[in-house]
Structure formats: C-alpha cells, structure tokens
C-alpha cells in the first residue's frame, strides 16, 4: 500500500531511502527492536497509522494492511501498558507483557 501510494505521488525513491534504515542491523535485531519499542511507542505509532490510512485513501488506495496495523496498535494503547518512565523492555519482557495484557485468545 505504502509503496503504491509513494509511486503515485512520485516519491518512491525517498520512501525506499527511509526504509533502508532497516539495513543498518541484522533483521533479527530489527524485529526485536520493533517489538520492544512497540510497548513504549504504540500510541504515537497508532496516531501515525491513522494519518497514513488517510493519505492512502486520498491517493485512491484502500488501506487494508494499514487499518489492521492501526487496530493492532490501538489494542496496545487500550491495554494501557506504556511504562510511565518510557523504559524500553527486553524482548522477553515485551513478549510477556503483550501475551498477558494485550494479545488475547479467541
């Protein structure tokens, strides 16, 4: 969705350049970092995904994946798990928090 929109807006290379930050560390570490920082930054990321969804719609793209990410982040926000001190937890602690307080079974 994002890349189609970037292409339509003529900014594909700029978007790809921003995404290249992921190349700076091993993929395993990058994924762990995303999970760990999700605990702290879910609220900001949720708001950002809302803006992304709006931009996609304005470009004529149905934001299916973006809305799923937005809902996932909202679930974390609603769980109220962001640490008051802003401390990023270890991967193990982050997964425990998500498992016990955010991601419920059906």
Report the location of each language-model feature.
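Short, basic/aromatic-enriched C-terminal tail that caps enzymatic domains
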Residues: 86-106
